[in-house]
Amino acid sequence: LSSIIEYRSAETGRHVQRIRMFTRVLLEDLARTCPEYGLDEARIQVISSAAAMHDIGKVAIPDAILNKPGPLTPAEYERMKDHTIKGCEMLAALEKATDRDYLHCAYNICRSHHERWNGAGYPDGLRGDAIPLEAQAVGVADCYDALTTDRVYKQAIPPGEAFQMILNGECGQFSPRLLESFKQVRGQFAALARRYADDAQAGAVSYTHLR
């Protein structure tokens, strides 16, 4: 299922693969520094695998919005935000799947990876640890990838600039603990971005908004 969106969107490329790897290294550091989260290797594997499903709901978004080479109108942006709910509806249809833990994790990620620590995200306006941890981690990974890769509506920005933007809250607020782990794995994120770069990835310097 996670590969379907790569055929619909001109901006995805190896995005799904990077998100899985970013999520893994972020959670590995969090497991080391915050054992209270109970993040053993098995749990990290489930979360990083389920991270591949985070944008599956974009298959329900019209191509004209998904691949628009410019800023979205307010109405288009509201429609784009529906990908979180549409993805959950798709995953709910798989309720008889044998791996229920994976499916539950994927559902949480799909629905809540655009939530933010201060309640300013969507679709539910969750705040703090009411946001599932797996969705919090994928939110950081997704934001970094959106900033550092070319999209149809923007050019990539350098990794160092993206790093500072996330820490400064310019892309919404994230968990302070996750941001501490993000600092620790900054080099790994940059290395993974290079290793799994999209073909013909450019390193330009501007962006408009994240979708």
Show where each model-derived region lies.
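Metal-dependent catalytic cores of enzymes that make or break cyclic nucleotides
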Residues: 6-210
